[in-house]
Amino acid sequence: MSKGEINHVNSWDVNIEDTTPAMQQYLKIKKEHPGILLWYRMGDFFETFFEDAVIMAKELELTLTGRDSGAKLGRVPLAGIPVKAADAYLQKLVQKNYKVVICDQLEDPKFVKAGQVVKRGVTRVLTPGTLTESNLLKQNSNNYICAIYKDNKKDLFGFSYTDISTGEFKTTQAPLNLIMAELARLNPSEIVAPSLKQDIKPFQIVADEVVNLPEEITKKYNCSKIPPSVFEENFASNNLKTVFKTTSLESFGYSKYKLGFQAAGALLAYIWETSKDNMPKFDRIESYELSEYMILDASTRKNLELVETLREKNKYGSLLWAIDKTKTNMGARLLKNWICQPLKNVDDIMARQNSVSELVKKSDVRLNLSELLDKIYDIQRLATRMSNASASPKDFISLKLSLSILPEVLDATKNLDYDMFAKIRDYADEISDYVQMIENTIVDNPPILLKEGGIIKPQVSGELDYFRDLLTGGEEWLKSFEEKEKDRTGIKNLKIGYNKVFGYFIEVTNSNLNMIPDDYIRKQTLVNAERFITEELKKHEDDVLSAKFKSTELEYKLFTDFREYSKEYVSKIREIADAIATADVLTSLSTVAVENNYCCPVIDESNDFLVKNGRHAVLENILPLGEYVANDLEIKSNVTTGDDTQFMILTGPNMAGKSTYMRQNALIAILAQIGSWVPADSAKIGVVDKVFTRVGASDDLTLGQSTFMVEMIETSFILNSATEKSFILLDEIGRGTSTYDGVAIAWSVAEFIATKIKARCIFATHYHELNVMTKKYPQIKNYRITISENNGEIEFLRKVVSGGASRSYGIQVAKMAGLPNEVINRSQELMTKMQKDFSKNLASGKKMVHNEDGVPQLSLFGM
């Protein structure tokens, strides 16, 4: 290997003794964190070496260079980034699901003796799920990390999740299908699970370790493995008891959710390990039952476009976009959570709805509250940074400004029937005192860097004021000293100067060198002058430099002491943040209700789903005003008479609006059960336990599954999971196979839902043969989307009316799509011929035959 060539060796193949002292330190730390990128602080840079440097250069588009690592290794791969730019690069790596170890300098290199290695240590392990830094997080979305632990004896999983940036921490246990629904809701950045040793393969010395989770999870989510022992009951429960300072976990629901608490304890251990000495504070852990909420599986969430659109993955065009009028990041996150987890308990739903209704009626309170909330920063995440000692001076100014608004918020809401701030009123004065403390301690516009100084206000510390006076009074002292020296020496052009290399100096031109006194000590010779120092000037220089260093160090200590003291307010600030978030969401929902002319729905335990002039919450905001066509829905589950509809067969052309109609009613159910008003003239919703949608599929090539296979899997899941309290939306069941197979499957699925499950269902289809099902099953009714036809041209009227459609108008839609006239004409010719043959075959009872043109003639499904 030539002298300048880089030796592409991996860290695990290196003999530590063959390297330099600094590299030995690096390798020892790297060995403790295998598989994680190690950022090693060297002066103003974070350096990476070996395989880490290669990854960094590739992922961050950095130049890969080399560093000498001793005679045997030569130059090893090196890639570095400036410390000041670290956050930007960290964000890119975390988004790519990399983990990063921060190894910082634990002492000032200036005070390290020559030949010695600077003391370094790991101060933080950043993983996608353990971020608290505001610039690494999405402001309007939670950043969840989950832990999952499977019971070896039965199909039950312990499940726990937290967003450490907000302090939310919950746990439960459930079978796999419900855990999958929870993962779809939370979309975690990281999942922690026990490792599992695989069988040793041929020629393999040590067995590989994988995450002990089902493939459905590991293929879709970013998973991290930790030792199974961390999930053991005693270890996990002791972790929880330590963090929550309790001797028993029974009050948290431990007995009912043991598996969940094992997952929670392991999750805490993982966070503890990654946070090092800066463990964020957790005030509480909540156990919850999934059956308390409406179940929405991953497919339903996507199809209904609850928080992002199906294709572009944008917020614009989603339900969240349509109803998000929140003013704070905390409120935006909470609204998203409400949409993703609708309630089932009528009392809980009504508590929210009553608050929304009150704010709808009291417009002065609503408008005032909205204006006040707009001034509040993200104090929820700020509280976490306070708890783990990462809050900056600017964070405290944001906190001060936010908490200063609290008295006005309390005053604005004091006469509401539902007081969102009732608990907070008890300690409002204490918070006001703390706000004043911030005001008295930290300057209004502090610097970004903590060790720059200029953070603490005057009169906080007499010692700090003394050092500052010494620094600010320095200019006056130098002017006075210069005048004194001019008088003493008689040198009128004598000057006092300063540079970083030589410090303070007295400059005398060559023509006046014969006048310098004996106490002048030469420092530097220039072309036309000499520079000198005196004992008095040197003492002043030492005092100033000492004062600057001592002032900065003292300010840093005063700030960190204040930050440590502020930790006792974290729990109260979180309570305030939660109340503000709730107020923000309720205000947002009431604003949307007023602006979009929503109605207050009746929510009860009945089997009804009655909507008068319902509208699509999203589309009516996108289409021109008044263009969206409203439609009714009257449907009930477990119907026993022929007067009511339980199962709606919906027919009509493509593009007529069948899917839109189905989705709009699902969104109305979800809005109603988060406590919102709904887009309709009136609505009565009997609580829905699950919403299922089968409204389109795409080939899953990664699993080798076709569109039809995906459709059948999703339909199977619905038929095995739905109850009579569910709301089912099925679109085009049976397409993708032969007509016989398709109609048979569609018929059987419809029959099963109508007679066995007895759930409320809208079944959109082009199989008009299904219209005859109403003769056998009175709970099934036919409906169609109306159109207007004139001279072969069709116009979509978008109105849902009773009765089945006799045609699908596929050729007319194809013409609208721009197919060549030759194709359209030939299609029309074939259609006319088929219809004639159908009529003949139906009359004679003949089965399908082929005519002389080779066109297949289809027999219809008969009763």
Task: Tell me what each language-model feature is.
Residues F45-F46, F50-G66, G158, E168-K170, ...:
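A conserved P-loop NTPase coupling/switch region
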Residues T20-M23, W39, F50, G80-L90, ...:
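Amphipathic alpha-helical transducer elements in NTP-driven molecular machines
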Residues M1-R333, W338-K361, R381-T384, N388, ...:
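Basic, polar low-complexity surface loops/patches
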Residues P34, F50-A53, Y257, K327-T328, ...:
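ATPase nucleotide-binding head domains, primarily ABC-like/P-loop NTPase cores
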Residues S370-L373, I397-K400, I573-T582, L586-S590:
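Hydrophobic alpha-helical segments characteristic of transmembrane helices
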Residues W12, R67-A79, K245-Y254, E305-T309, ...:
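Short hinge/gating elements
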Residues E233-N238, I295, L310, L401-E476, ...:
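Amphipathic heptad-repeat alpha-helical coiled-coil/stalk segments that mediate oligomerization
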Residues C103, P128-L137, N278, D417-M420, ...:
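Active-site phosphate-binding and catalytic loops of NTP-dependent enzymes
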